[in-house]
From Swiss-Prot:
One Pfam family of this chain: Homeodomain
Protein's gene: CERS6
The keyword Membrane appears for this protein: yes
Protein name: Ceramide synthase 6
Organism of this sequence: Homo sapiens (Human)
Any one GO molecular function term: sphingosine N-acyltransferase activity
Length: 384
């Protein structure tokens, strides 16, 4: 075991040339990041998850009810053993031939069977109230952590001159504010990892899981080898658009369509500007070129930059989805569907949609268009 640990913590991998772990031990004069500090993230992640449950029940839910957001979920499909067996064992989306066979077997018309399968697919999906509460929690956290990050960074020299991320590296003392910022972000991402399996499932579950893994690894990696200064820039930059996204979703669930559209436009502008403009030209420039000039490359430097390039790849993917949504919104006159959502249609739409009608333009009995306008979800921080 000792040999494995010695191999894993090899100084030649983690640290620049001629630097040892002994050089980064805490002293009375200076405190440096220590790997054991990160253990604190696990109990804090649990605490954040518990705070979320309390917040959603006692803060977000009353707000949703005050906005007349429905608490009821989709209509439950009537019990039918034959259809249930087909649904669970064969297919959730029967083709025309199977529908005709079931119609003869049950003496139901095809439209009734189609409706049953739609209701059955949707009956376990959460209500709009649940979605609103989830978005309000994320909005509140993202707003807080982004505000904290801005207030912290505006007092630091590396915000105004990124070369300060590498001056005297790795002998850069760890301040209390920086330590708090890092542990808070890491704890939140661990809580997302746990809650992703109980939250609303979306089509991009795998991509978001990968994103959370990369985020956790980047935060952990940059803390251990004391790249925390540039790490704070990455974190704050990727947090900048997330609160706007969740605000747009809340406006959508509350049926404030004009506000939803405005917030989505603001989100899209901030997201694309920060992820495709500022991040590569400012952050990647300093991690790839300024650090090479001032510190020089070493093994963990390559890994860190490869992870940042992977994050940039995810940024490009999500930017593509945002542009895709924006183009659809222009053609329809409003934002009406999240390309990453798992939603097929609203519960009302399931009952009223005639065969062959375009689900994106169908009008529900609630007076909304399409699929209640579910937007792009998730934070993309070191994110998103």
């Amino acid at each position: 075991m000792a040999g494995i640990l010695a191999w894993f913590w090899n100084e030649r991998f983690w640290l620049p040339h001629n630097v040892t772990w002994a050089d980064l031990k805490n002293t009375e004069e200076a405190t440096f990041p220590q790997a054991e500090d990160l253990y604190l993230a696990f109990p804090l992640a649990f605490c954040i998850f518990m705070v979320r449950l309390i917040f959603e029940r006692f803060v977000a839910k009353p707000c949703a009810i005050a906005l007349n957001i429905q608490a009821n979920g989709p209509q439950i499909a009537p019990p039918n053993a034959i259809l249930e067996k087909v649904f669970t064992a064969i297919t959730k989306h029967p083709d025309e031939k199977r529908l005709e066979g079931l119609s003869k077997q049950l003496d139901w018309d095809v439209r009734s069977i189609q409706r049953w399968f739609r209701q059955r697919r949707n009956q376990e999906k959460p209500s709009t109230l649940t979605r609103f509460c989830e978005s309000m929690w994320r909005f509140s956290f993202y707003l807080y952590v982004f505000t904290y990050g801005v207030r912290f960074l505006k007092k630091t020299p590396w915000l105004w001159n990124t070369r300060h991320c590498w001056y005297n590296y790795p002998y850069q003392p760890l301040t209390t504010d920086l330590h708090y910022y890092y542990i808070l972000e890491l704890s939140f991402y661990w809580s997302l990892m746990f809650s992703q399996f109980t939250d609303i499932k979306r089509k991009d579950f795998g991509i978001m899981f990968l994103h959370h893994l990369v985020s956790i690894f980047l935060i952990t990696f940059s803390y251990v080898n004391n790249m925390a200064r540039v790490g704070t820039l990455v974190l704050c930059l990727h947090d900048s658009a997330d609160a706007l996204l969740e605000a747009a979703k809340m406006a959508n669930y509350a049926k404030f369509q004009k506000m939803c559209d405005l917030l989505f436009v603001m989100f899209a502008v901030v997201f694309i500007t920060t992820r495709l403009g500022i991040f590569p030209l400012w952050v990647l420039n300093t991690t790839l070129f300024e650090s090479w000039e001032i510190v020089g490359p070493y093994p963990s430097w390559w890994v860190f930059n490869l992870l940042l390039l992977l994050v940039q790849g995810l940024n490009c993917f999500w930017s593509y989805l945002i542009v895709k949504i924006a183009c659809k919104a222009v053609s329809r006159g409003k934002v009406s569907k999240d390309d990453r959502s798992d939603i097929e249609s609203s519960s009302d739409e399931e009952d009223s949609e005639p065969p062959g009608k375009n689900p994106h333009t169908a009008t529900t009995t609630n007076g909304t268009s399409g699929t209640n306008g579910y937007l792009l979800t998730g934070s993309c921080s070191m994110d998103d």
